[in-house]
Amino acid sequence: MAPFGITPYFYSMNEVKPIKRSVHLQPLSREHHDGLLFVWKIRQGLSNHTNIEKLKEFTGWFWRNHIKPHFFQEEKILLPFLPASHPMSLQLKNEHDYIRELILTIDREADRYDFIRLVNLIETHIRFEERELFQYLEQHLSEKDMMEIYEQLEKHPVACEEKWNDEFWLKETAK
């Protein structure tokens, strides 16, 4: 059973179609792209047998610089446009809480399994937001509401740039 009702997404390459995202939500989608790159980098690091401490450092850095400010945007800017009891609102909050807990666990003590759980959850969470939550918002919110979201996102940008020097994910065997 997946935690907090998280639905895994299984699909073949033939079923994947690019999503035409509203310009109002594109800043969040760009950040999601960075999140998927994080997932790929951690998986590559695990595959390359990168030292757990190095993965912990990178995860902590990515949390502070990308995930935490991104969660702020979603929780303080998007969620007010959904009723607190809406299933998608509850799922977003629950998944954010679970990701936070995993990152705190990794910060204290981590093993490879913790990283696998984290990247699987982040990937599933991003897919939920892109394929369900954002589509719902685009279909149900007014142009005025969407513009308000966009303006708030512009006031609280998350830097979508990589400032991590050790590219452990590119190494054959990182130690």
Stretch-by-stretch model annotation:
Residues P3-K175:
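Small-residue-biased structural context
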